[in-house]
């Protein structure tokens, strides 16, 4: 089973596309951000290497959102810079399989990106998506999120330029995530990554949920490891 899980990275940390692309940040995406941000409703399931794993049912959705969280002393600004560094994902997100990530466009507030996820199993198409990521909360009242991202509408003309392989790809268009840094009474923050993504296709829900948990955990651990390396360089 672990070999199968490593080939599916549907929840891989995600991200985007720029001017001229229509966003799918509609009413249901706004509601999804609210559900992810709300600390009520998360059910703890497990803890590994000091990282807690929780899930939460999302109204009207067949799958559950996933949250991983850990206390850390790494400054949130460093973590934020790591997550926004889409162009270098392939260098430090080493545990999520052979994905391809591209930074498409960047402004002072957001970065647009693309990810391609090859699926090495019969009868199951590869996955791809465009996303937009912001270095702040999802609205003016959200003061704890340091990153929020959401998927973008499909644009075939853009996708052909990014991945011209001739295969049956499934485009993912409904998903969002939050990286939150909640202050504590000590010098630590509670860093959490909360995500909901529909991987598309006719896959059993239990299998998708299990794969999503593994993938989100790996993204979280790799991002923290990279942030620690960058912190050590700054301190030197």
Regions found by a protein language model. Give the residues of each.
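Hydrophobic h-region of N-terminal signal peptides that target proteins for export
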Residues: 13-22
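Intrinsically disordered, low-complexity regulatory regions of eukaryotic regulatory proteins
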Residues: 2, 21-24
């Amino acid at each position: 089973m672990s070999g199968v899980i490593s080939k599916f990275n549907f929840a891989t940390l995600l991200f985007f596309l720029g001017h001229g692309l229509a966003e799918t940040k509609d009413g249901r995406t706004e509601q999804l951000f609210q559900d992810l941000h709300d600390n009520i409703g998360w059910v703890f399931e497990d803890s590994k290497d000091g990282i807690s794993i929780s899930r939460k049912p999302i109204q009207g959705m067949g799958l559950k959102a996933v949250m991983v969280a850990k206390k850390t002393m790494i400054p949130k600004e460093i973590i934020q810079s790591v997550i926004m560094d889409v162009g270098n994902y392939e260098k430090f997100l080493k545990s999520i399989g052979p994905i391809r990530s591209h930074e498409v466009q960047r402004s002072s507030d957001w970065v647009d990106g693309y990810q391609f996820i090859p699926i090495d199993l019969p009868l199951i198409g590869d996955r791809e998506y465009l996303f937009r990521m912001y270095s702040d909360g999802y609205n003016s009242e959200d003061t704890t999120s340091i990153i929020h991202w959401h998927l973008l509408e499909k644009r075939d003309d853009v996708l052909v330029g990014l991945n011209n392989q001739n295969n049956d790809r499934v485009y993912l268009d409904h998903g969002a995530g939050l990286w939150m840094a909640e202050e504590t009474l000590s010098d630590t923050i509670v860093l959490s990554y909360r995500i909901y993504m529909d991987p598309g296709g006719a896959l059993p829900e239990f299998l998708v949920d299990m794969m999503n948990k593994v993938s989100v955990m790996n993204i979280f651990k790799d991002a923290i490891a990279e942030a620690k390396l960058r912190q050590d360089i700054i301190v030197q």
